[in-house]
């Protein structure tokens, strides 16, 4: 059954040669004694011709239908002038078939195997093996493969050691909900699928491996969205005896190599900006800004603190802020009805309304313009860095609500007005100097902004002492952002037990609880751990961006849907009572 070539790679260089090809039937066009078949494989499509000169092959062609698997042998010839297709690599040639064999038949597929197919998402996931035949999906998964190959090559040439860490691990209270795996041998006890290899890679540094790398699977039982899945893949790195700056330089070189290998883009890492977390929040309202959007959020709190507009004045008096976004050209684009839609949407961020004005040649117009005299209007326009024709959108109130609201409005308006700079397709940025802690509304307490093993800035270590306010501390942590997505997160780790114990105490752990959860790590630190740091880059998210997709499902072979189920295999499913009994588990019958 040996084939000589991939069908999609046949071009003019193969003219007058005999080839043997295999693949799937994309289309069949029957003209009696002349039949055309488009044969598809992973590389693309080539046109086959069957005619009465080769009667046996023609008889086979009369039987084939879409998605039949075919093997043919034939001669590569030039297409007739009216048959040339400039959209495909093989568009100037075709294969005159002399031998043909049907290797497999196919039922009529539930949707067309072609890009831009108009099919229900659940249906495509149910028949994922058919969806994966589409050229776009083939391209996406090959981009993913290239990223992994490039990463492994880079790490190998930079003396990193590829080490696997356990998938059945201990449940530790360090982040999202764990996926638990019951133990048959120890009834009532559970393993947890790892949310990251974090603790194991720190222990590997303690073991002296110095440079660790792994393409690791990780699992988090959390609510899903377009750029998250319950199981995901990260390119995980840990190093000893390197500073945060040195680690970022290493990652810059790594990302530069990947961009060249995968999308043939020459990334100038010297132009990757570094922003503090606070600067990013002030300018963009988010810790993962899309720097392809030129306009930024402006703080107008000082400008409007004595305003006659009660919403602004009361926000300032209540300890809040007033900020604005000047949307270029937005005045003509957005009607009152359009703005009402934006107002309704931002309620999910806690915003109670959306104040707005338009910048006209004669000054500001809109429902709240009457509260500002000419001098106040001029001050507003200047403070917001606005121009005639701009739409001014305001956020007033609690700082976090204002940030979330204006971040969304910045991204949404840029998309609607086509204001995303396409000349800068890959806008990377480093976000540094993060708060060590953040307040969680879900848990109603302070939690680690990254994880409990992040080293505070040297000058902030005293905040972990008794009597100090630990929430003032900042961390030696850093995130790599690309086009408004968090691509990777890393930090310098705590390598001293005294600091780690203080950190856990600040998070509410008693000494007993700390040793119950992390005793193995704390004990390891008593045996001489080196200074260490690392990062993990999300493979799924990077592949999504490099493939030009908007959902990571498009770059994962067999993903879950938004309900964390897998329509093709119908996972998760209930299991037999015998299996539950062996595990010492009781599950009530479903109603």
From Swiss-Prot:
Function, in words: Catalyzes the attachment of L-aspartate to tRNA(Asp) in a two-step reaction: L-aspartate is first activated by ATP to form Asp-AMP and then transferred to the acceptor end of tRNA(Asp).
GO MF: aspartate-tRNA ligase activity; ATP binding; catalytic activity, acting on a protein; nucleic acid binding; transferase activity
Record: residues binding L-aspartate: 174, 220, 450, 493
Classification via HAMAP family: Asp_tRNA_synth_type1
Quaternary organization: Homodimer.
InterPro entries: Aa-tRNA-synt_II, aa-tRNA-synth_II, aa-tRNA-synth_II/BPL/LPL, Asp-tRNA-ligase_1, Asp-tRNA-ligase_1_N, Asp/Asn-tRNA-synth_IIb, AspRS_core, GAD-like_sf
First-level EC class: ligase
Protein residues bound to ATP: 220-222, 229, 486, 538-541
A GO CC term assigned to this protein in UniProt: cytoplasm
Annotated stretches, region: Aspartate: 198-201
Source species of the chain: Leuconostoc mesenteroides subsp. mesenteroides (strain ATCC 8293 / DSM 20343 / BCRC 11652 / CCM 1803 / JCM 6124 / NCDO 523 / NBRC 100496 / NCIMB 8023 / NCTC 12954 / NRRL B-1118 / 37Y)
Enzyme Commission (EC) number: 6.1.1.12
Protein name: Aspartate--tRNA ligase
GO biological process, one term: aspartyl-tRNA aminoacylation
Chief location category: cytoplasm
NCBIfam families: aspS_bact, PRK00476.1
Cell location: Cytoplasm
Family recorded in the similarity comment: Belongs to the class-II aminoacyl-tRNA synthetase family. Type 1 subfamily.
Alphabetical keyword list: Aminoacyl-tRNA synthetase, ATP-binding, Cytoplasm, Ligase, Nucleotide-binding, Protein biosynthesis
Reactions this protein catalyses: tRNA(Asp) + L-aspartate + ATP = L-aspartyl-tRNA(Asp) + AMP + diphosphate
Pfam families for this protein: GAD (PF02938), tRNA-synt_2 (PF00152), tRNA_anti-codon (PF01336)
């Amino acid at each position: 059954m040996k084939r000589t070539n991939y069908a999609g790679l046949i071009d003019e260089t193969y003219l007058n040669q005999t080839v043997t090809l295999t693949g799937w039937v994309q289309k069949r066009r029957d003209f009696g004694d002349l039949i055309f078949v488009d044969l598809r494989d992973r590389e693309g499509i080539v046109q086959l011709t069957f005619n009465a000169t080769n009667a046996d092959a023609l008889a086979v062609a009369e039987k084939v239908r879409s998605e039949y698997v075919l093997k043919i042998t034939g001669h590569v010839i030039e297409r007739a002038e009216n048959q040339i297709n400039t959209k495909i690599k093989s568009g100037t040639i075709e294969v005159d078939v002399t031998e043909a064999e049907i290797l497999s038949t196919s039922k009529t597929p539930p949707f067309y195997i072609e890009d831009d197919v108009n099919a229900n998402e659940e249906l495509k996931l149910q028949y994922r093996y058919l969806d994966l035949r589409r050229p776009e999906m083939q391209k996406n998964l090959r981009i993913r493969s290239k990223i992994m190959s490039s990463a492994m090559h880079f790490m190998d040439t930079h003396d990193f050691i590829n080490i696997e860490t356990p998938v059945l691990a201990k449940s530790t209270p360090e982040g999202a909900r764990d996926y638990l795996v019951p133990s048959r041998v120890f009834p009532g006890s559970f393993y947890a699928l790892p949310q990251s290899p974090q603790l194991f890679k720190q222990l590997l540094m303690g073991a002296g491996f110095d440079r660790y790398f792994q393409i690791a699977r990780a699992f988090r039982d959390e609510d899903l969205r377009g750029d998250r899945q319950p199981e995901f893949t990260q390119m995980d790195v840990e190093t000893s005896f390197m500073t945060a700056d040195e680690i970022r330089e290493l990652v810059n070189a790594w990302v530069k190599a990947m961009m060249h290998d995968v999308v043939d883009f020459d990334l100038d890492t010297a132009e990757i900006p570094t922003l503090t977390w606070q600067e990013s929040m002030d300018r963009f309202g988010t810790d993962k800004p899309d720097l392809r959007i030129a306009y930024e959020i402006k703080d107008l709190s000082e400008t409007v603190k004595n305003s006659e507009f009660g919403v602004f004045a009361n926000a300032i008096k209540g300890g809040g802020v007033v900020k604005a976004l000047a949307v270029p050209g937005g005045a003509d684009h957005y009607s009152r009805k359009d703005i009402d839609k934006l107002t309704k949407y931002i309620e999910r961020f806690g915003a109670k309304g959306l104040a707005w004005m338009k910048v006209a040649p004669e000054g500001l117009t809109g429902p709240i313009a009457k509260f500002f005299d000419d001098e106040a209007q001029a001050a507003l326009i200047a403070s917001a860095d606005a121009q005639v024709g701009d739409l001014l959108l305001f956020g007033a109130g609690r700082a976090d609500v204002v940030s979330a609201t204006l971040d969304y409005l910045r991204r949404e308006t840029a998309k609607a007005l086509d204001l995303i700079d396409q000349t800068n397709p890959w806008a990377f940025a480093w976000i540094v100097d993060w708060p060590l802690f953040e307040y969680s509304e879900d848990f109603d307490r302070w939690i680690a902004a990254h994880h409990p093993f992040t080293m505070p800035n040297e000058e902030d270590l005293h905040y972990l002492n008794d009597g100090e306010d630990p929430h003032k501390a900042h961390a030696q942590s850093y995130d790599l952002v690309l086009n408004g997505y968090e691509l990777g997160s890393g930090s310098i780790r705590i390598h001293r037990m005294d600091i780690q114990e203080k950190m856990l105490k600040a998070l509410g752990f008693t000494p007993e609880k700390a040793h119950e959860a992390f005793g193995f790590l704390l004990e390891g630190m008593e045996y001489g751990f080196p200074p260490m740091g690392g990062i993990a880059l999300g493979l799924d998210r990077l592949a999504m961006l490099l493939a030009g997709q908007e959902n990571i499902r498009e770059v994962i072979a067999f993903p879950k849907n938004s309900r964390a189920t897998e329509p093709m295999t119908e996972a998760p499913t209930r299991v037999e009572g015998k299996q539950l009994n062996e595990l010492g588990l009781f599950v009530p019958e479903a109603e």
